[in-house]
Amino acid sequence: MFAELAERSDLEHAKPYAELVRKAADLGFAKSGEMLASMPFHDEMSDSVFMATPLVVKAGKLTGERKYFDLAARHFAFMQKLVLRDDGLYRHSPLTEAAWGRGNAFPALGLALALSDFPKDHPAYAHMMAEFQRHIFLLAHFQDAEDGMWHQVIDQPGSYAETSATAMIGLAIERGIRKGWLDPAMYQPRVDQAWRAVLARVGNGGQLVDVCESTNKQNALEDYLHRAAILGPDPRGGAMAMLFATEMADLP
């Protein structure tokens, strides 16, 4: 939020927000200035590709300091080594191979946001872009052809259709199309189907259908399959639906 405020405010009002972005990104460096292997506090789950990578990239954009782009690339590589499965999907954490829905939506959206601000001349850009495109290509094959949804566990079609993951993946794909990273002929129909699916699961009063509850590291596939699906208001799912809406509306 404060990264967006830093970009959208006038110069005088942007300064405190930009400073917050820089301070958060600086957690990835030791007191000596040496770059850490990953961003601390949130580096054990695939969520971290979303939680940390775009923020650190934004610090690079706001300050013009290349070290932040280097850190973002290093953090992404660290997380891939930790949670990327051999088949290209992401496990949520090393505790289990389960490809949790939101645990794959986080890397998809995190990379889409990070690449939007990442310099094309950086040595890591080509790899990060290739990984984004590869992951989206794979995720597309797991979209439910009937209702346009992705599921609570990506490769378990018997798990419930999950709204927040669908919104996040749809958003990531739409961003990729808008930026010219993804082929519209291949992906726009999938985005449109996902958008209709999300619209059908968001009520006029903000009620949501089938949003997975807050989920920490779980010990087994069955734990993800049995996570509660929220019926009602949920800030997490609502935020992702709103972000998807702004992307579909092509808002700056």
Where are these regions (language model features)?
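Carbohydrate-binding/catalytic loop surfaces
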Residues: 1-3, 37-51, 87-106, 147-168, ...
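Extracytoplasmic mature domains of secreted/periplasmic and thylakoid-lumen proteins
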Residues: 1-51, 55
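CBM-like carbohydrate-recognition segments
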Residues: 2-6, 12-19, 156, 160-161, ...
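Inter-helical turn/loop segments and adjacent helix faces that build the functional surface
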Residues: 8-12, 59-70, 114-126, 176-185
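Long, well-ordered core segments of solenoidal/helical folds
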Residues: 16-37, 66-89, 129-147, 190-207
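Oxyanion-binding "anion nests"
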Residues: 110-154
